[in-house]
C-alpha cells in the first residue's frame, strides 16, 4: 500500500509507535503500519493532531487535503 485515501466523514487519525490508527468515534476502524505508506489523501472532514502530522512528516509520509465546494 503506497497511498491511503480517506473519504469518510468524522474519522480521526492518531499514531501509536509506528502505526496509524483510524477511529470512527470510539471504535478503531483500522491499524495501518506507517512503513507501508508514502502518502495520505484526505477528501472529507477528518480530525488529525499536529503530533500525528509531525510523525507522518518525520517518516517522509506526505499528506494531501482535498477540499470540494458543495
Regions found by a protein language model. Name each.
Residues 1-70:
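N-terminal intrinsically disordered, cationic/polar leader segments
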Amino acid at each position: 500500500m503506497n497511498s491511503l485515501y480517506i473519504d469518510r466523514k468524522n474519522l480521526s487519525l492518531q499514531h501509536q509507535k509506528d502505526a496509524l490508527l483510524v477511529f470512527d468515534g470510539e471504535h478503531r476502524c483500522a491499524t495501518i503500519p506507517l512503513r507501508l505508506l508514502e502518502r495520505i489523501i484526505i477528501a472529507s472532514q477528518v480530525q488529525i493532531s499536529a503530533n500525528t502530522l509531525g510523525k507522518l512528516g518525520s517518516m517522509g509520509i506526505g499528506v494531501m487535503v482535498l477540499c470540494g465546494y458543495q
